[in-house]
A protein has these predicted regions:
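Second-shell loop/turn segments in exported
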Residues: 71-72, 114, 150-161
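Soluble periplasmic/extracytoplasmic beta-strand elements of cell-envelope proteins
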Residues: 84, 147-149, 186
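N-terminal catalytic cores of peptidoglycan-degrading enzymes
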Residues: 2-139
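Cell-envelope and extracellular/periplasmic
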Residues: 89, 141, 149-155
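A conserved beta-turn-beta hairpin within the catalytic core of GNAT-like acetyltransferases
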Residues: 144
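Basic/polar, cationic surfaces and motifs that engage anionic cell-wall
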Residues: 4-8, 24-59, 154-210
């Protein structure tokens, strides 16, 4: 009887171990499938500005940065859980100026900073980094957020109407694309307490309206 009980216990233990292994394998497969789905969603091979516009996006000028450790490290985004809105803090600079600054960091090495998109003073939108990759913009949320830098004319940080309209349209399109809600559109301020985007930190009602 002891031998039978021992054999039964061993059998039960083997069944439990087998069950745990199967669950772990299935979990790993689901994670891989999820990652593959996210990468497919972000694959720019079969998509472009015209396709995106048909889906509700503003025109996006794709000027991807040269891979480098200071502005485009090519680290994978864990997932798009947030859309983070920033202001450039350099009044009068254009979207192209800011994009070129990010690009030049590969040479100057003065900082690690970048953004997925930059929206200009006239509403133009430049994409600097694929949405499947991480940007250096939102501190602890770099790993799971898509960042939008916004140009502004003066120190108040208020967006021009053209800039505002493009930001709203771009954020709405990204929300639709990644299944997000307006609650997942955040300010840099909401992550770190930094006064960014300045006008929309100083005027919470304007942020809520946006």
């Amino acid at each position: 009887q002891r031998n039978q009980r021992l054999a039964l216990l061993v059998l039960l233990l083997l069944l439990v171990v087998t069950g745990v292994v199967i669950l772990m394998v299935r979990k790993g497969q689901k994670q891989e499938e999820s990652a593959e789905t996210f990468q497919e969603t972000n694959d720019h091979t079969n998509y472009g500005p015209e396709e995106w516009m048909s889906q509700g996006a503003p025109y996006i000028d794709v000027q991807l940065l040269t891979p480098n450790e200071y502005s485009r490290p090519q680290l994978p985004l864990n997932g798009a859980d947030y859309i983070a809105i920033h202001y450039t803090a350099n009044p009068g600079a254009t979207a192209q100026n800011n994009r070129d600054y990010f690009e030049n960091l590969s040479i100057s090495h003065e900082a690690k900073v970048s953004s997925h998109f930059v929206v200009g003073l006239e509403g133009e939108v430049i994409q600097c980094i694929p949405t499947s990759e991480m940007s250096y913009a939102t501190n602890s949320r770099n790993v799971d957020s898509i960042s939008i830098e916004c140009c502004h004319k003066d120190d108040t940080g208020v967006f021009e109407q053209e800039t505002y309209d493009s930001v709203v349209k771009l954020a709405a399109w990204l929300c639709a694309r990644f299944g997000l809600t307006s609650e997942q559109v955040i300010r840099h301020y909401d992550v770190t307490g930094k006064e960014c985007p300045k006008y929309y930190v100083d005027h919470p009602d304007a942020w809520e309206q946006m």
